């Protein structure tokens, strides 16, 4: 069984999603060893600079993210130099799981994994992501016979669950899982 970690707080994202976008965008989504679901292409029109803002998250207010798309399979994300000192670039993948489109972003840390958020809306000029609501994740996990385990870190606490359980939750309860989750808005910077 693989371990999956819901990341609590997009606060770390700014420090890490960035240590990391979504410890990278790291901050608000379950951690999984690999992206789940059917691969979807990443449009080349998404390449460029994006201003990132998140509701109730002090760490990633109005930060700028450079997005590169080379082959349509993934996007490479890199925070702009003033916000990215020492942070590696990471890859982001778009997946379809059930009715839900998800963005998986590499954690960029030594534990290797991915954080995820739901793609609420996508256009060439604006992307809105919603992080999973941890209370709803815990409730859904319990309803399906699973249990979240917590690991504390310096700035946050992560919940862990195996990827099989996460997949069941996403297939059966994805509508509930993202209700009241932190919203992350990316707006394209026009030069």
Each model region followed by its residue ranges:
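Calycin-type beta-barrel ligand-binding domains and close structural analogs
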Residues: 29-45, 53-64, 72-191
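C-terminal motif of bacterial Sec signal peptides marking the signal peptidase cleavage site
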Residues: 24-27
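Bacterial N-terminal signal peptides that target proteins for export
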Residues: 2-17
């Amino acid at each position: 069984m693989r371990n999956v970690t819901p990341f609590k707080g997009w606060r770390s994202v700014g420090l890490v999603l960035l240590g990391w976008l979504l410890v990278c965008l790291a901050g608000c989504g379950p951690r999984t060893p690999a992206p789940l679901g059917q691969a979807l292409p990443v449009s080349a029109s998404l390449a460029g600079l994006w201003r990132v803002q998140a509701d109730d998250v002090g760490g990633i207010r109005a930060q700028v993210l450079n997005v590169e798309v080379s082959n349509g399979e993934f996007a490479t994300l890199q925070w702009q130099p003033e916000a990215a000192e020492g942070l590696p670039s990471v890859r982001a993948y778009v997946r379809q799981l059930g009715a839900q489109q998800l963005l998986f972003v590499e954690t960029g840390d030594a534990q290797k994994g991915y954080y995820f958020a739901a793609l609420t809306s996508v256009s060439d000029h604006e992307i809105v992501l919603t992080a999973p609501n941890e209370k709803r994740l815990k409730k859904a996990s319990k309803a399906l016979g699973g249990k979240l385990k917590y690991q504390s870190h310096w700035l946050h606490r992560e919940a862990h669950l195996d990827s099989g359980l996460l997949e069941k939750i996403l297939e059966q309860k994805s509508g509930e899982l993202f209700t009241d989750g932190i919203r992350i808005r990316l707006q394209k910077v026009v030069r």
